[in-house]
C-alpha cells in the first residue's frame, strides 16, 4: 500500500514537529548537494529552526554566495528586470558561440584548400586526408544518386512521349478513314453535274421526236387500209 497524502499544515505536537523538521532538513541538504554536483550550480542554503538554530550548506561559501546575490540584485535594480539581464547574458553567449563557429569554419576551409597544411604535423595531415576522402566519397555517392534519378526520369518521359505519338497517329488514321466515303460521294455528285452541263435537256426536241415518229404497231395497222382504198374491186 502506498502512503497517504500528508496535509500540509503546522504540526501541533512539538515532538512530531521536531522529528519532521530534522527529516525534511536532511532531505533538503541532500537535494542542495545533488543540485550543486549534478548541475555545477552554486548553491547556498540557510535554514533557521523554530528555536533559532542555524543550519547552512554551500558548495563554495555562504558569504561569497550572499555577496554575489547582493551584487546581482543591485545590478538588476539598476539595469532592469531579471528577464532583461538574462537576455543580455544569452546575447553575449550567442555572440561568443557565433565567433567560435566562424573561426572553426575558416580553419576548416583553409585546411580543405591547403592553405594551412604547412604548419601541420604528419598525424594532422593524415586526419585531414581521411576526412577529405570520406567527403569525396559522400559527394560521389550523392552525384551518382542524382544522375540515376535524372536518367530514370528521362526514360519515363520517353515512354510517355512515345505513347502520345502513337495516340496522335491513330487519331490521324481514323480521320483519314472517315473522310474517304465523303470524298467518294463528292466525286459522284461532281460527275453527274458535269454530265448535265454538257448535255442540256431540250423539251422541244423531245416533242418533235415523239410527234414525227409513230409507233410501229400503229403504222402497221394503217397500211392494209390504205392499200384496200387504192385497189378496184375485182368482179368475177
Swiss-Prot record:
Q: Which InterPro entries match?
A: MADS-box/MEF2_TF (IPR050142), MEF2-like_N (IPR033896), TF_Kbox (IPR002487), TF_MADSbox (IPR002100), TF_MADSbox_sf (IPR036879)
UniProt GO cellular component terms: nucleus
Effect of a null allele: Homeotic transformation of stamens into lodicules, and ectopic development of lodicules where they do not form in the wild-type.
The record's subcellular locations are: Nucleus
Report the Pfam families cross-referenced here. K-box (PF01486), SRF-TF (PF00319)
Query: Can you provide one Gene Ontology molecular function annotated for this UniProt record?
Result: DNA-binding transcription factor activity, RNA polymerase II-specific
Instruction: Check the record and name the SMART domains matching this protein.
Output: MADS
Query: Glycosyltransferase: present as a keyword of the record?
Result: no
Q: In which tissues is it expressed?
A: Expressed in lemmas, paleas and lodicules.
Keywords, A to Z, come to: Activator, Developmental protein, Differentiation, DNA-binding, Flowering, Nucleus, Transcription, Transcription regulation
Q: Please list the residue ranges annotated as the MADS-box domain.
A: 1-61
User: The K-box domain covers which part of the protein?
Assistant: 87-178
Any one Gene Ontology biological process term? specification of stamen identity
Gene3D superfamilies (UniProt xref): Transcription factor, MADS-box (3.40.1810.10)
Give the protein's function: Probable transcription factor involved in the development of floral organs. Acts as C-class protein in association with MADS58. Involved in the control of lodicule number (whorl 2), stamen specification (whorl 3) and floral meristem determinacy (whorl 4), but not in the regulation of carpel morphogenesis. Plays a more predominant role in controlling lodicule development and in specifying stamen identity than MADS58.
Q: What else is known?
A: The transformation of lodicules into stamens is observed in overexpressing plants.
Protein name, as recorded? MADS-box transcription factor 3
